[in-house]
From Swiss-Prot:
UniProt source species: Drosophila yakuba (Fruit fly)
Biased composition (Acidic residues): 391-400
Function of the protein: Required for cytoplasmic pre-assembly of axonemal dyneins, thereby playing a central role in motility in cilia and flagella. Involved in pre-assembly of dynein arm complexes in the cytoplasm before intraflagellar transport loads them for the ciliary compartment.
GN (gene name): Nop17l
Name of this protein: Protein kintoun
SUBUNIT field: Interacts with Pp1alpha-96A, Pp1-87B, Pp1-13C and flw.
Length: 846
């Protein structure tokens, strides 16, 4: 703003010769009072007349000449004599006059024979001396401000200009060049006028000074301080006058002049733009209207010109003699040309055009911003939620559950434009490319193509579908906002004549385009397809994947067929051998004809068909069967009570390996597919943080052995949920129940928007590792002593139990775990057996 204001002040000072008048208020009041007196005004007018008197001016010039001669300077006063006047415009804003005058004090014009270097023709080369006066302000016939310049030549030059038009034009060009070069202005040469005036204004003499050829005696005397300064070297010769360079090529004069103009953005104050709404500053950069100001100093009114305004341009044309203007201006915004206003200021000779700007609606602006944001978006590899939620930090104590899965952005299907077959599909003026990589998969009667082309515009997808072929074209926008066009033609193989395309669906994603072809129900699954840029450039490609939903369903049905499970009791080894094989069709038909009691028995046998896992200790690799649990003594309680002879020890025979797990014989196969909410973990491993504590049996064993009071099933599923607490099982041991308590503390994760996701993930992983090592160190220090003490007491109790089993009156056969499977009363009353059972349960877990 300050630069433009300073430029405006300099221009006004240059055009008007305004000088700063330093006058105080007191001095201004004194001058005002003096002019109010009649005596002072009379004296002032007498002074003006004395100055303007020619006799007095002559005496004044003689005195000045004598004074300058005493100083060694020759002074000549030049009095311009009228010649002719040139009228034009100064910088396209101000009217100006150039007086072509004559004076005897100026040297005569000289010529010499010269040869034109461009054409080789001989001619005369003129040297025209001239003199210029300072510019002055004046008024025109309508009392408007104007500028006046004087250019003085010798009278012989004016005489030649009257007789020769070429010399006259040369004189005019010389005067115009002198004014532009001296005052750094631009003159309108296309609109030159020659009014019927000999001279504009009052002639003012000018002075030419030069050193005197014959200096006076006083000037020849040395200066008293001349010896103190070094002498100036003498000039090599007589100084020659300055010669202006002659133009080798004439300046082309345009037929029409481009007037000066300015475009101003007008914006009124709207209080709605100062609110906190999202769309408050949507139009803050768009002006309310455009004001176009055109300077026309040579026109009297707008009737002499033609003005045409459109939504994006302004056109001005004037062909009046002496005022030829032509302007074609492009506007920065779309305007309403029907609601515009134009006004011509006759004093300033300025045309002002006010045009209201057409603003887009809020919906169109939002759509445009979304499109630009989509084109300029850089994929950072991080998916953000649509509601601007920050991603949750990973759980430091454990991984998140499967229910908190990642949510991927789902693109809406794109409705592609369908063209008719008779119209040309691909444009001849556009270069199309075939996608460099594409895949094809077939699922039943649907062919899915994945075209790996990123940043596809959904609006550019067009397709041409026929009975056995499809032609697709689309465009992408790169980083330079330059569109790239692609085309893809696919055709079904010729061997499948019955195949036909029923429907087509094209979806534009961020990194690819998914094309789905739905074939008719009679179509066979193709093993290959033809693809290319168009029908003339086809190549056969194989189908990568073929999937049949019906066939896979039958295979799964066969795999899920019931298995045949057999149990063989070994009396000598007191062990139970389990044989599992797939059942035949005859056995299945026979099993369907069995009665309900046999079905119950079959369910009891199928509850043992799942493999039981075993955990072995890391040091001695000691094997122990899972059937030695606290609840195994109730599995065959009723059958063994009736037949006391068959009381073997139930043990699964599996090869020796470390960290085995098997299903218990008390497991029910019907509910084996359900999983409980309790975490299965090792005693010495890290514990999940989702629960504070569990029962003693959960701390010791990786499998559930809880008992419920139902008559049909005495035991819960090994991997089932938490059993309901019932009053009927109050007599059972509390260690056979699953209990869990949840912590009331809520973990809160905070994610900073300015932090790096990879850096935050590394920090969380390091924190989890430190916490895990500290927890393992605490467990290893406290549990090692407890384990040795528990193991010693358990071994002693096992020896006592083996002695009781060898007694003849015992009548009970015990497992090596100390549990009575016969259901004898003496076994339940023995308190040592219960302690041994719990001790060995702790020993089973590694």
């Amino acid at each position: 703003m300050s630069a433009s204001a300073a430029r405006s002040r300099n221009k006004q000072s240059k055009l008007r010769d305004d000088e700063q008048l330093d006058i105080s208020k007191d001095e201004f009041n004194r001058i005002q009072e003096a002019f109010g007196r009649e005596e002072f005004r009379k004296l002032f007018f007498d002074y003006v007349e004395e100055i303007q008197d020619p006799e007095n001016r002559k005496i004044y010039e003689e005195e000045i000449t004598q004074l300058e001669k005493e100083r060694g300077v020759e002074v000549r006063f030049i009095h311009p004599k009228p010649g002719f006047v040139i009228k034009t415009a100064l910088d396209g804003e101000l009217k100006c006059f150039i007086n072509i005058a004559g004076s005897e004090e100026i040297e005569r014009p000289k010529n010499e024979v010269a040869t034109d270097p461009s054409s080789g023709s001989r001619g005369l080369s003129w040297s025209i001396p001239m003199a210029q006066t300072s510019s002055r302000d004046d008024c025109d016939a309508k009392n408007n401000h104007c500028k006046v310049f004087d250019v003085v030549f010798h009278p012989d030059a004016l005489h030649l200009a009257k007789r020769n038009k070429q010399f006259r034009q040369c004189l005019i060009d010389t005067a115009l060049d002198a004014v532009e070069r001296e005052y750094k202005v631009s003159l309108d040469r296309a609109n030159l006028k020659f009014p019927k005036l000999d001279y504009k204004g009052i002639p003012r003499p000018t002075v030419i000074r030069k050193l005197a050829d014959n200096p006076t005696a006083e000037e020849q005397e040395p200066h008293p301080l001349a010896h103190m300064f070094p002498t100036k070297p003498p000039a090599p010769g007589k100084p020659e006058p300055r010669v202006l360079p002659m133009k080798t090529k004439p300046t082309p004069v345009p037929e029409f002049t481009v007037p000066r103009y300015s475009i101003k953005h007008s914006h009124d104050v709207d209080l709605s733009e100062y609110t906190d709404e999202l769309d408050a500053k949507l139009h803050v950069t768009v002006p309310r209207s455009l004001v176009v100001e055109i300077e026309l100093p040579l026109l009297r009114s707008t009737a002499e010109c033609q003005l045409d305004v459109t939504s994006k341009s302004v056109y001005l044309f004037s062909e009046r003699q002496g005022a030829k203007y032509r302007l074609k201006l492009d506007l920065p915004f779309s305007v309403d040309d029907k609601a515009g206003q134009a006004r011509f200021d006759t004093d300033m000779r300025r045309l002002s055009i006010t045009l209201p700007v057409v603003r887009k609606s809020t919906k169109e602006e939002a759509q445009m911003h979304d499109t630009l944001r989509h084109f300029s978006r850089e994929d950072s590899g991080v998916e953000l939620h649509s509601n601007s939620e920050s991603p949750v930090e990973e759980d430091p104590d454990g991984e998140l559950s499967d229910s908190k899965a990642d949510i991927s952005e789902i693109s809406s299907p794109t409705t592609a434009t369908v063209r008719l077959a008779n119209s040309p599909f691909l444009k001849n003026s556009v270069h199309y490319q075939l996608p460099s990589k594409f895949d094809c998969n077939v699922l039943d009667n649907v062919m899915a193509f994945v075209l790996h082309v990123p940043n596809v515009q959904p609006d550019s997808i067009e397709q041409l579908r026929e009975q056995r072929s499809l032609h697709l074209q689309f465009a992408t926008i790169g980083s330079g906002y330059y569109p790239t066009h692609y085309a893809f033609y696919v055709e079904l193989p010729a061997e499948h004549e019955d195949s036909a395309i029923e429907s087509v669906e094209a979806e534009a994603w961020d990194n690819n385009v998914v094309l789905k072809l739905c074939l008719s129900s009679q179509s066979e699954t193709p093993a290959s397809y033809l693809a290319g840029l168009d029908a003339t450039e086809l190549k056969e490609y194989p189908v990568h994947g073929q999937y049949n939903v019906k066939s896979s369903g039958k295979a799964n049905a066969k795999e899920n067929a019931p298995l045949d499970v057999k149990f063989v009791h070994n009396q000598e080894g007191q062990a139970l051998k389990v044989t599992i094989r797939p059942g035949t069709k005859e056995e299945e038909e026979k099993g369907n004809q069995d009665q309900e009691p046999e079905s119950d028995k079959q369910h009891q046998q199928q509850s043992q068909n799942k493999k039981a896992g075993k955990k072995q200790r890391k040091r001695n690799k000691k094997e122990r069967s899972l059937s030695e649990s606290a609840c195994a003594d109730m599995i065959f309680q009723e059958p063994l009570a009736k037949n006391p002879e068959l009381q073997p020890k139930t043990m699964f025979k599996f090869p020796s390996q470390r960290k085995q797990r098997s299903y218990s014989e008390c497991n029910d196969s019907i509910g084996g597919s359900h999983r409980g909410i309790l975490k299965r973990f090792s005693r010495y491993g890290p514990r999940p943080s989702m629960s504070d504590s569990c029962s003693s049996i959960d701390d010791c064993s990786s499998y559930s052995c809880s008992v419920d009071a139902s008559g049909t099933s005495l035991f819960s599923h090994s991997f089932g949920g938490i059993p309901e607490e019932d009053r009927s099982d109050a007599g059972l041991s509390e260690s056979c129940k699953k209990t869990v308590r949840f912590n009331d503390h809520i973990m809160k994760q905070v994610f900073r928007l300015d932090s790096s996701i990879l850096g935050q993930r590394k920090k969380n992983q390091k924190r989890r590792d430190l916490k895990l090592r500290a927890q393992q160190r605490r467990l290893s220090e406290g549990d090692s002593v407890d384990y040795e003490e528990t193991r010693g007491s358990a071994l002693k109790q096992q020896e006592n139990q083996s002695r009781n089993c060898n007694k003849p009156n015992g009548g009970s056969v015990l497992h090596d775990s100390g549990l009575d499977l016969t259901g004898a009363p003496g076994a339940h009353s023995n308190h040592n057996e219960s302690e041994a059972k719990n001790a060995l349960m702790f020993e089973m877990d590694d």
